[in-house]
Amino acid sequence: MIMKDIAVYRYPSNYAHEHGELELYRASQKANLACKEAIEAAIRENYRDNCLNTDAVKQVMAQFGQERVMYVLANTVQRKDWDCRISRDNKAWAKTISVFDDPDAQGTDRNCYFVVNSHPGLTDLFVTRARKEIAEQEKEQRPSAIEKLKQQPKNNSPKLSANFKGQER
């Protein structure tokens, strides 16, 4: 199965168990881990001369889809909230995405397994680029106000009432 086609399962394992959705949960967890590893590889392979190639983000999003990439990045930033090398903007953005705690039998949060372990400064740069990429995609998809007006029908004549019988005096 292609990783991009696996739905992002946002709920913890106990919820998945109670609702008979363990297969969805497990598939999503595997995809999250693979996405985390792909992000680390993309950063490693695309960082040269103090610059992160913009293709790094596109490459991972093409493989996993923007929802999963952003979920993994939000989880990473939330878990590294203490790190001052991650920008305030990215920390504020990460808080807008729900990532439920998912404790195992020993109390360890399973979300720790898909935290990106690249240098925090590079991770921050990747998050910023990913957010910018999504904003650009949304801007391209959203028609401008002028385009919307051009698409509207030009029938501006007043509608006649059903009770209208002709010109009144």
List PLM regions with ranges:
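Gram-negative host-targeted secretion-system effectors, predominantly Type III and Type IV
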Residues: 1-168
